[in-house]
């Protein structure tokens, strides 16, 4: 074999190995999963033969886990908060401590639309905004502005003598828009 052929085959082999390494899947990091929760749930709920005893054991182990406060990282909270920004940090932390991973918390939020508050947590009361009613009235008032009154246009006499050409064009434009709207509304009825 020629030396260039050997060099070509070697380069192809190195390229193949390099591409194989680049395409191989990255092993998942368990950054968002709490391992000891899944171990406790698998041993706590399947070992008992009596269903009543099983529920008691599971609830006791769940309470002890809640009291011991599992480590929930800030990155876990940030991931959930980026998906559901209306949730409080306490709601997210409580649900992450309960479920053990971000995926279950996000799924629960998607199904329920909200997450439960921790026991004993008092929901912060948002102060009532007394300015909501005046704002609504302002919006309604702004919507019902009559352009004929605003620009002093006489609908009965559209060709009145005004000095400004701009004013006349504006008047014609507003009257034309009113006529088109009236025609459109009469066609719909």
Swiss-Prot record:
Subcellular compartments: Endoplasmic reticulum membrane
Domain of life from the UniProt record: Eukaryota
PROSITE patterns: CUE, ER_TARGET
Membrane-spanning ranges: 6-26
Keyword Nuclease: no
Lumenal topological segments: 1-5
Function: Component of the endoplasmic reticulum-associated protein degradation (ERAD) pathway. Recruits the soluble ubiquitin-conjugating enzyme UBC7 to the cytoplasmic face of the endoplasmic reticulum membrane where it functions in degradation of misfolded or regulated proteins localized in the endoplasmic reticulum (ER) lumen or membrane via the ubiquitin-proteasome system.
The protein's name in its UniProt record: Coupling of ubiquitin conjugation to ER degradation protein 1
Organism field: Candida albicans (strain SC5314 / ATCC MYA-2876)
